[in-house]
Design a protein with these regions (language model features):
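Boundary/entry segment of secreted carbohydrate-active catalytic domains
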Residues: 19-55
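Substrate-binding cleft of secreted/luminal carbohydrate-active enzymes
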Residues: 22-27, 114, 250-315
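Hydrophobic faces of well-ordered beta-strands that scaffold small-molecule active sites
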Residues: 24-26, 42-46, 69-75, 114-118, ...
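Alpha-helical scaffolding within the catalytic cores
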Residues: 26-34, 53-63, 98-103, 178-181, ...
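Solvent-exposed loop/turn segments at secondary-structure junctions
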Residues: 49-52, 77-81, 121-125, 198-203, ...
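Glycoside hydrolase catalytic-domain groove-lining segments
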Residues: 56-76, 213-263
């Protein structure tokens, strides 16, 4: 009975509040987005730079408390000054353990539902952790898809927490270096780890496909895609293929938006996709910042469609 009660509590923590409800989120100014759309955003998407906050007491805790009620933190390998701070191989070998543990412990102190979204759009050449350059050339073994998968598994285990002995045993089982930090990491049953590629790679090569970076079902809680309407075209087929390729996983749209155009048909189609695919648990609009090319404030037709078709999905 105690075990069943524990499982029931976890379901309340990690799933939308009502049957069929979807968590709606936004990047940028939540208050402005609510004024624009009427949406009471549950999720706030935030972006981090590698190791930012390690030398600033309270900063990492504020990433959670200031991006509630449900923060979605995107972890990047870019340093705050723009250069690459660590490679996927470096993460896989444990050289990022101190930073990752700080985030995990902050999530535990936060104590409520949160998403961790490590190394998103990994099959996009603009990210340091992609295995390929825009011309299709290989970036080398430190950035290989294999090392990415290993890095993601390590991140997952740290974010979920556990005793040092248990985590090290799990790392050993997959041939990885033990933790480079001392002590246990508090467990985080309320944290959902999101694996978020693009539906197809850029460069669009078989070896740079989304699933080339997939770490395995046991290291992913939610599969997600980023989907933008660019020149009145969005990659819906790739989105559906990604959705179908992981039938046991909940799904999210980690970022979606209109790239400098006013296209209400895209908004309506997003609503249709969500309604017709019950595994979708969250969609996050990018972004609410005034004057940004994605700002719904400059897109009256799409804004009206958002109010009519998207906002009710969160009810």
């Amino acid at each position: 009975m105690r075990r069943l009660l524990f499982i029931a509590v976890l379901v309340v923590l990690v799933l939308p509040a009502s049957a069929g409800a979807v968590r709606l989120g936004v990047a940028g100014n939540k208050a402005r987005f609510r004024t624009l759309t009427g949406q009471n955003s549950q999720i706030h998407l935030a972006f981090t730079r590698w190791k930012t906050g390690l030398d600033r007491p309270g900063y990492i805790d504020r990433l959670f408390t200031e991006n509630g009620p449900i923060p979605m933190l995107t972890l990047d390998t870019k340093h705050r000054y723009g250069y690459e701070a660590i490679t996927p191989r470096g993460i896989a070998k444990g050289f990022g353990d101190r930073y990752l543990t700080r985030i995990s412990k902050a999530a535990n102190r936060f104590g409520s539902a949160a998403y961790i979204r490590p190394l998103a759009e990994m099959n996009g050449h603009w990210n340091y952790y992609c295995a390929y350059n825009s011309n299709g050339s290989y970036r080398g073994s430190a950035h290989s898809t294999r090392n990415f998968r290993r890095a993601f598994r390590r991140i997952y285990l740290i974010m979920k927490g556990g005793t040092r002995t248990d985590i090290n045993a799990r790392l050993a089982n997959i041939g990885m270096h033990p933790l480079r930090i001392s002590g246990d990491i508090p467990e985080n049953p309320h944290v959902r780890v999101v694996w978020n590629p693009q539906g197809f790679g850029s460069p669009d090569l078989a070896k740079n496909s989304a699933n080339s970076y997939y770490p395995g079902d046991r290291y992913v809680d939610v599969v997600a895609n980023d989907l933008y309407d660019i020149r009145f075209k969005a990659e819906w087929d790739a989105n559906l293929a990604l959705f179908r390729s992981h039938p046991s996983k909940r799904y999210a749209i980690g970022e979606w938006g209109l790239w400098g155009i006013d296209d209400p048909a895209f908004v309506r189609r997003m609503a249709s996709f969500v309604r017709n695919h019950p595994r979708v648990e969250a969609i996050v609009y990018y972004t609410s910042e005034r004057g940004a090319i994605w700002d719904l404030g400059s897109k009256p037709k799409s804004l009206a469609a958002y109010k009519r078709y998207i906002v009710p999905l969160g009810s």
